[in-house]
Amino acid sequence: MDLFHTPAGALDKLVAHNLHPAPEFTAAVRGALGSLNITLQQHRARGSQRPRVIRIAKGGAYARGTALRGGTDVELVIFLDCFQSFGDQKTCHSETLGAMRMLLESWGGHPGPGLTFEFSQSKASRILQFRLASADGEHWIDVSLVPAFDVLGQPRSGVKPTPNVYSSLLSSHCQAGEYSACFTEPRKNFVNTRPAKLKNLILLVKHWYHQVQTRAVRATLPPSYALELLTIFAWEQGCGKDSFSLAQGLRTVLALIQHSKYLCIFWTENYGFEDPAVGEFLRRQLKRPRPVILDPADPTWDVGNGTAWRWDVLAQEAESSFSQQCFKQASGVLVQPWEGPGLPRAGILDLGHPIYQGPNQALEDNKGHLAVQSKERSQKPSNSAPGFPEAATKIPAMPNPSANKTRKIRKKAAHPKTVQEAALDSISSHVRITQSTASSHMPPDRSSISTAGSRMSPDLSQIPSKDLDCFIQDHLRPSPQFQQQVKQAIDAILCCLREKSVYKVLRVSKGGSFGRGTDLRGSCDVELVIFYKTLGDFKGQKPHQAEILRDMQAQLRHWCQNPVPGLSLQFIEQKPNALQLQLASTDLSNRVDLSVLPAFDAVGPLKSGTKPQPQVYSSLLSSGCQAGEHAACFAELRRNFINTCPPKLKSLMLLVKHWYRQVVTRYKGGEAAGDAPPPAYALELLTIFAWEQGCGEQKFSLAEGLRTILRLIQQHQSLCIYWTVNYSVQDPAIRAHLLCQLRKARPLVLDPADPTWNVGQGDWKLLAQEAAALGSQVCLQSGDGTLVPPWDVTPALLHQTLAEDLDKFISEFLQPNRHFLTQVKRAVDTICSFLKENCFRNSTIKVLKVVKGGSSAKGTALQGRSDADLVVFLSCFRQFSEQGSHRAEIISEIQAHLEACQQMHSFDVKFEVSKRKNPRVLSFTLTSQTLLDQSVDFDVLPAFDALGQLRSGSRPDPRVYTDLIHSCSNAGEFSTCFTELQRDFITSRPTKLKSLIRLVKYWYQQCNKTIKGKGSLPPQHGLELLTVYAWEQGGQNPQFNMAEGFRTVLELIVQYRQLCVYWTINYSAEDKTIGDFLKMQLRKPRPVILDPADPTGNLGHNARWDLLAKEATVYASALCCVDRDGNPIKPWPVKAAV
């Protein structure tokens, strides 16, 4: 759509549908840049001679949030430890850039789904450039890799750089903007914290600029970043509101471009006149030929550069644009630009009226002209300084009558002043004029230079993970003063409605995020639920609600004429079942959306910790209501459910909701052409679910919690979450309703107070894309730059999963990632070969073989963290009893070679050798580079090669076991010697049986979390064997019913006192020694589960089977073990003893 042919009223639509980047491409780019970030960070660790990457910052239009659809740019600034000063950046570049280019060539082979990679011609020395483009070529982003000196260090929210940063910059004798990359983060934050609508205006201005570029191809136009700053200046001086007319804003920016030869703009957000060297430099900069637009992060960079750029071409284009359709209102009248200090005014040819902020801030240069910077660090000031010689006023500014009147009043009582005092007096009077003039645009207690953006919190993605607690406290928690005012207003409203209503009020309840204690700074919601006697049941609410609401509105309209001091109140768009109001602080920095809802008192007053009567919910379900139609009736239960959460969990909720708000605000009116996203309340519940299942501690890592929730959001199509704290599946009506809900499409997030309300409904796609993008950012990195892991949480719970869905549950949540398993297999093969070839090379000891064991080798590993063994069989062990000798020396030798292997080979997975000083155990971990929760922990175990080279399907020589029996003093002492047999016993089983083993192991791990601290559970391997036994005795059907198999294993666990399970696949009673030993083992107290590879290993002995049996009894009646009619699934007919 052409800008000039778009009516003024349709500009928002033009921006939303034509200028915002395509969400699919944005998501793909974020994923690619996150992957590249990790690649660059890891590059530092390989080879100690290479410069270390301290951190990586993103800049450019992409990072500032001002990227246009089609093509845009991003800077990846790589801060290296080899740069100790600005000057160092000119050296040690060719080798560094060469290494990075090789890295890029490798990475660029697979930059990400739907993207192509191509190197570009670098526009400057000391940088690398390439382009990522969509497959169809319609969307692209130019990426610049810029190595830089980390002069600022780890950025801290709201902290200004120290003056010596800029004085050292100036003393480096750099060219203008030569080291601007060092200041990427403050530059990005300056723009990024602005309101969404202002960024839309920036997109509109840049779109106009690109149209000019196509017509003026030979002209050297100023960079588009200059127009971003000019747009911010125009908004700060003329508007300052979050909501405004795009046509009026565009008209103002073009008017400034038309008057560009008078422009002199700078900010003191990051630097100022306090330091003598910086102050003197700024004075010189402000005398440069107009336009002057100083970069707010780097004072050496005059982005406006009147001597270099053809602003005159832009000025001509701007002047010719004013009569276009985009500036015409529906009535045909042209929109007018904003008015304010430093902006064009009717009848004035220049911008000759400087901004002054206060009498104590005047700074005089050697010609007596004044320039001023703001003293308020919390604001983002812009300064128009045309009072220098090159921009002397040509036509006096139009006199302001109010200003003259002020001056006359002051002169009556004035004493004679020096020239300097007179100048200060002039400034002081001008301040009052500026503030009163701007009052039509801004709250009265904010100066004309403050912005809505200055109230916005910093970009979450750039907050270091260790600072998240402080970030929440400083930026997300609501103002206590405003909360107190709101409480007073609510009490007054309730008092008004109680006293004057013609209907009897039974009681009231406060809900919404304000009532739940999860309200964010800036804006939140409150539900005032008023229970009336006349509303006697669910069905009877609708007929009376309309008249009650009319009565409420009449009372409140009278009351709102004198609301609580410091607050304003207004009625907003109404809903059929509620009265909608908005309370706002007088400075408009905080607001509350208030819903007043008349409701039926279904629950009645409840004592703490008690459940509503089951008939409450059965009557709700029988009322034929719509989903969540009567949610207000359960407001107290909803509030109490969240109010009991620990304080840190509520902090995590605030962080998640802040991220949610950033995402929704960013895309509001943009691509959001589909369904609305789920409500923020859904993310509160998701946060509680994540914490309950993955942590449960009072103290925890906010970054780990946030990553867990973002991961669940990405898995939204599998979410199935509900609680039974208020309603129970034991009630037939509720059970039937829940079963019906559970058969619906995901996501399912049931309100814990109202089972009819699935709060998970909505479009999660955008949230999922943004969650993936945030995953590689600073906020989710640990101090050493590695990504923090998520908690171990699945999107659905086993006991809440329908029996018919167990196969799907296993495939989605329990099966490990196949690609990761392949990577692990390759890595383990490399490690095994390396150990076999290199260990004990200069010794008589030989590595006979290396065998893989554990769940990973058996094919029963779970998704997430699993275990495995590497058993190294050595020639120095000639019998069982020798296995413990020289263990420390052997472990030390293997460890040295493992570490060498780690250095010499490149792996697809992250390879970490444990540094534990344990002479018995050597461990290492293989972790996925992309799936943070996927890893395998290996134990390296030296062992005696008792079995030798066994042929497949053959039995060991009986002498192996007689020697074992004579040598063994502790049960299972030499089980590592039989790793191959243990592995083969499971690997030979059908795939579906391995799936059942996974299910049983997952259940066991969940029980372990619940039982933690109460006692030692049986070993997990024992449950694997019990599962095989259940299947063998239950018919050995390779395609069995998963719920029946699971139910059978649970039943055997309940009967643990009768368990006696063993196999004679590898050993038998035919040999007298073995036979006598087996009889002795089988006479031991139950349960007995003998290892089929090692008869000395009784896996049922000395464990708290009673605790496991209790959990098995609970699960036997859960949804995963009942059929569609709610009847318990029957187990297979299996005896507890062979």
Curated annotation (Swiss-Prot):
The lineage of its organism: Eukaryota, Metazoa, Chordata, Craniata, Vertebrata. GO terms for molecular function: 2'-5'-oligoadenylate synthetase activity; ATP binding; double-stranded RNA binding; metal ion binding. This is 2'-5'-oligoadenylate synthase 3. Its EC number is 2.7.7.84. Keywords: Acetylation, Antiviral defense, ATP-binding, Cytoplasm, Immunity, Innate immunity, Magnesium, Metal-binding, Nucleotide-binding, Nucleotidyltransferase, Nucleus, Repeat, RNA-binding, Transferase. Mg(2+) binds at D867, D869, D939. PANTHER family: 2'-5'-OLIGOADENYLATE SYNTHASE-LIKE PROTEIN 2, 2-5 OLIGOADENYLATE SYNTHETASE. The keyword Ligase does not apply.
